[in-house]
Amino acid sequence: TTPEQARSYVRQIAKDKPDLIKLMITGGVLDAKVKGEPGELKMSPEIVKAACEEAHALGLHVAAHVESPQGVQVALENGVDTIEHGALPSEAIIQLFQDRKACQVATLSPALPFALFDRHVSHVSEMEQYNGKIVFDGIVECAKACLANGIPVGLGTDTGCPYITHYDMWREVNYFHKFCGVSN
């Protein structure tokens, strides 16, 4: 894909009047090829920038599936408005969130079974569990750091992932309290 193709895709999607454009900037736990490296970058910075510029020119916000620090950095440096999931943030990443006035949507529910369930229950491989723990911890630490720095954090469930249904938002709220230490 080229930057111009990315712009073209955004224009095509915009014809259907979506609420936003969502980019899949990284992979995740299930497609990781290396233990300890979930969230492999799937989009170049140039593609992300082109898609974001086009979406913003059309009045659309851009959300991005991101599950690695590199992915968060590429997303924020190139115009993404909201990080879906998240990853272990550095001080530079927190500064990017602030500079861009971006936010995070934490999704603990889909990562939790991979990270914390017994493998006899989750039926995941040892590598998927290991990488799931990295992603889960990254989402939690990203949310904590964002909150500590006045960056808005929303909650989502990532419905459709294993063990996640359309009516599981109550679990997400419970996990947010339990793992991020947030209450009302």
Where are these predicted regions, by residue range?
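Glycine-enriched alpha-helix->loop->beta-strand junction motifs that scaffold or abut catalytic
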Residues: 77-82, 98-104, 122-126, 150-152, ...
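Structural recognition of alpha->loop->beta junctions
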Residues: 73-93, 150, 172-184
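A cross-domain feature marking catalytic cores of carbohydrate-active enzymes
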Residues: 23-25, 64-68, 85-87, 106-108, ...
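Active-site environment of divalent metal-dependent phosphoester hydrolases
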Residues: 27-32, 66-73, 88-91, 112-114, ...
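Divalent-metal coordination cores built from histidine and acidic residues
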Residues: 1-60, 93-95, 100-113, 117-120, ...
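His/Asp/Glu-enriched, well-ordered alpha-helical/loop segment
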Residues: 57, 61, 124-127, 136-184
